[in-house]
Amino acid sequence: MGRVRTKTVKKSSRQVIERYYSKMTLDFHTNKKILEEVAIIPSKRLRNKIAGFSTHLMKRIQKGPVRGISLKLQEEERERRMDFVPDESAIKTDLIEVDKETLDMLSALGMSDLPGVVKQAAEPQAVAALPSYGRGGGGFGRKY
């Protein structure tokens, strides 16, 4: 059964990770020794709790960004994603292919002369239903 971690343990381990991220590892014993060197912690029990939570957070950081911890590497990655500009726009409107029904609706609204709107070349075919087996539990045509 898990234990409740106090605010002191959580805050101190977050601060230690932010400041000494390059030294911290995924190993509890190594993190405990690092905490001994870099922080003044009054008791052995509290030091072990902080080292344990720091190890837990380091494992979570490996998987992705963790709320409450601001690392330079993560901030740079986030900025890179925000500044990304695609080569080709996703909302390119040079040519829009619509079916006959949509074209009729546009003409009813008086918007049939929009630039770039063209009728689709071929009508989409209706998909034939596959035979179902058993009691029809959504098996997508599986026999077994």
From Swiss-Prot:
The keyword Ribosomal protein applies. InterPro entries: Ribosomal_eS17 (IPR001210), Ribosomal_eS17_CS (IPR018273), Ribosomal_eS17_sf (IPR036401). GO terms for biological process: translation. One of its GO terms (cellular component) is ribonucleoprotein complex. Keywords: Ribonucleoprotein, Ribosomal protein. The keyword Nucleotide-binding does not apply. GO terms for molecular function: structural constituent of ribosome. Belongs to the eukaryotic ribosomal protein eS17 family. This is Small ribosomal subunit protein eS17. The lineage of its organism: Eukaryota, Viridiplantae, Streptophyta, Embryophyta, Tracheophyta.
